[in-house]
Amino acid sequence: MQPATPLVLCVLLSQVLLLTSAEDLDCTPGFQQKVFHIDQPAEFIEDQAILNLTFSDCKGNDKLHYEVSSPYFRVNTDGSLVALRNITAVGKTLFVHARTPHAEDMAELVIVGGKDIQGSLQDIFKFARTSPVPRQKRSIVVSPILIPENQRQPFPRDVGKVVDSDRPEGSKFRLTGKGVDQEPKGIFRINENTGSVSVTRNLDRETIATYQLFVETVDVNGRTLEGPVPLEVIVIDQNDNRPIFREGPYIGHVMEGSPTGTTVMRMTAFDADDPATDNALLRYNIRQQTPDKPSPNMFYIDPEKGDIVTVVSPALLDRETLENPKYELIIEAQDMAGLDVGLTGTATATIMIDDKNDHSPKFTKKEFQATVEEGAMGVIVNLTVEDKDDPTTGAWRAAYTIINGNPGQSFEIHTNPQTNEGMLSVVKPLDYEISAFHTLLIKVENEDPLVPDVSYGSSSTATVHITVLDANESPVFYPDPMMVTKQENISVGSVLLTVNATDPDSLQRQTIRYSVYKDPAGWLNINPINGTVDTTALLDRESPFVHNSVYTALFLATDSGNPPATGTGTLLITLEDVNDNAPFIYPTVAEVCDDAKNLSVVILGATDKDLHPNTDPFKFEIHKQTVPDKVWKISKINNTHALVSLLQNLNKANYHLPIMVTDSGKPPMTNITDLRVQVCSCKNSKVDCNAAGAPHFSAATALLLSLFSLARL
């Protein structure tokens, strides 16, 4: 039997090796189940096993190491998942990373409410045990690689391994993708012989959460033998980001007297960590309230939603009794669901207690006194009120109304926007002789309506007693203006009218004296006692001081008061026209060519300062008594113009032609004007009047000049 023992051992050893080889061929490295659904209990109990995870690297699991994405759970060496403390984590996802020198894999654990999935936890696990894991028939075996972010030195460090059971001898592994040969380059690399994947530096999940890499085998010439096969690298989140309030400033408003539980505002923070983990699960609380009166807890914040609500009775939200209607809250957001290990961030919430019109304005006293001189206008008294509401709102701003004692609308009242006082003004002069006293009833209200349970009381009305002081009023002309119509040129000393001024101070015995104030032409005089106005010069309608036939003068009436008062009256004198102005012609100079075929010389016009009918039609004539020559002719064009023409051509010279023009007044007025006619040479379209410099007279004129010269000898 002994000789057979080595043979038997060899046979047994070959069978063991064969079985082991067969087992290796049937083994797939990794978790036997990739996804687990866990019913949410009322609470995970510390150190209580939740489930068992089965991982195999097909090499005996030597140096097996587990990592859990949540710091509140761990996996024991036997594969049992346990909670490190009593905790709730509804709807969250956990990742378990298993790794040996030969393989690594990741399992996903979804913690859900009992209604989210069908069946019990035991049924799910039973289904998982009876459901085979599908296998991919390929020689390159890859599993997702999980790498915690923010790892420390040393680098590079192995994070996973790719297995190819059928890799030909001499072939190599090649790794490509973002993070390898694409930006950011050089983060990952693979041992081309062993398939070990390593990371060269620490990772930041908030920058890149996953990397999609590709593995393939290539021959010595770089040609692909198998693949590429996708390899996913998942960066496991760490709680390395504090919550941040990004939407400030945070300002909220709540009306005073609001019921308990009134929502003021919402404050939410942002956490850059993985939202599927407690690293970004935020809880809110109020760290500080300023001021802390009348209660240190005026507000409450929903720890999950961030809604800030009132928690005091409406009576404590009385803006008028608060030291300061503005509250500042330091709001803290903490991740890890508010646990002590969580990171925090803070922001300030400013809450304004807004005013409502729950206080009516009240006069500071029931009666006000005012004194005003008759004839004076403007503000005579300021009415003061008190209102406890917010001075920046319509609940405080006052609106005043005169409700009695102002039938003549002599008074108005307006609100001073700075002081809220009522400024009572006289807008029409008061007459002491008519009424020396006035009594007004004033009402005050707010711009905004009062709240339903508040009304205006007796303190919202006040009486104003106004005393009018007598003043020496100026005499008043009646009528004013005074108007009279007279012919111009009436004789000097003619009486135009008698003016009349009365003194409004009927209770005083005063005398009135008259004087001239403005008399631009100096034509008038007034009797200081009786007011009779007469002329001191001829009244000329054509004077530059007369406008549209009206002359204006001003007179003064001064009483004997102390000090005296003076009134002004206006006199308008309408002057009727008389024919006292002779007409005159225009132009008075003309030119004509010595060889002109058209013998027309000039068209004359006439004007008259008088008014119609003392003006046109005008009569134009050549004063024949001094012009016997029969070389000129004048012809009527219309009522105001005539044409002067030649009967024959004349030599170059200056000719003086007397023109007589007569108006249509009764009696008519006549004016004789010399028309100077220059006869010029007009050769080759050039006008030369130099030879016309010497005057030319008619024969009769020459004879008269000769006789005059002889007489002087």
Swiss-Prot record:
> One Pfam family name from the record?
Cadherin
Q: Which residues form the propeptide?
A: 23-138, 694-713
Record the organism.
Answer: Bos taurus (Bovine)
Know the name of this protein? Cadherin-13
Q: Bias regions of kind Basic and acidic residues — which residues? A: 158-172
GO biological process terms, semicolon-separated: adherens junction organization; calcium-dependent cell-cell adhesion via plasma membrane cell adhesion molecules; cell migration; cell morphogenesis; cell-cell adhesion mediated by cadherin; cell-cell junction assembly; homophilic cell adhesion via plasma membrane adhesion molecules
Q: Under the GO molecular function aspect, what terms does this record hold?
A: beta-catenin binding; cadherin binding; calcium ion binding
This protein's UniProt keywords = Calcium, Cell adhesion, Cell membrane, Cleavage on pair of basic residues, Cytoplasm, Glycoprotein, GPI-anchor, Lipoprotein, Membrane, Metal-binding, Repeat, Signal
Where a lipid (GPI-anchor amidated glycine) is covalently attached, the residues are: G693
Summarizing the function annotation, the protein's role is: Cadherins are calcium-dependent cell adhesion proteins. They preferentially interact with themselves in a homophilic manner in connecting cells; cadherins may thus contribute to the sorting of heterogeneous cell types. May act as a negative regulator of neural cell growth.
